[in-house]
Amino acid sequence: MDAQEEAEITILEISYLGGFVKYDLHTKGGNVDVVRSYYKYENGNMKREVIGNYQAEYWNYTEEGYLMFSGVWFSVELYVLTLSGAEEHTALRVQPLDETYRELSRKYLNPISFERNNMFIVDWSEEDFGDLNFYDMYDILYPKVNGQYAPYVADDNLSVSAVYQIPKEEFESVIMKYFNIDSETLQSKTIYDSENLTYEYKPRGFEEVEYPEYPYSEVVGFTENNDGTITLTANVVFPYAGDSKVYAHEVVVRPLENGRVQYVSNRIIPSEDNYRETWHTPRLTLEEWEELYGGE
């Protein structure tokens, strides 16, 4: 592309929905044109569902082995519904990643990921949990423990913040299944009512929503430690930003019986190239909440 020569390539990306995406890329004069087609297997035949095209506004092959490109694509079906195009941010791994690394990512990192939590954003450990937000962790871990979403939802009236009192045993049974933390420490990191033995819980409100584009962590190395824990080294890949290494971090996990796991620590690896976590919106502080809702 840098030489502005003419070339073309076709790339197939398997979809988790049961079909695949076909990218026909053509470059000439320094520009890259993309034709994007989605195919679905139906009634014994492969059927093309959607086709769209765009000129890539961003294009890069990264040191981490990713082909990343983005642009605004148009299709007849989409235009009928929205009268506009849709942004697409594509990250295709070209260099193969060891299957062991992929499995470690699927097993330990993907279940937490980056949506509405700061577990892989801040430094913390079992000795000092730092700024790890246990209310966000409760939201994420509750379905894994109980098989359904937590019943503590936001108020229908956006001007009112719902406040719940969760029984001590209920709150701790979720958190302590994935963290080696005692009651006293957990209470110091939350709002705890010692008289009623409950944890105060406020679901995320309108001011705490996030733009629904998130990165993912990809294991690129690991060490099995003598104490039975595993140290995972991972890169944060953010297709929306066209960045295959927003930053690198180390996550220590403790595998337990029956496929269970405890999360031991997270550490951001310092680098001048680290990029800030633009996707994350933290929960309101107590002062911010009081200012917005007047303590109601």
Regions of interest found by a model, annotated:
Residues 1-296:
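Mature, Sec-exported extracytoplasmic domains of Gram-positive
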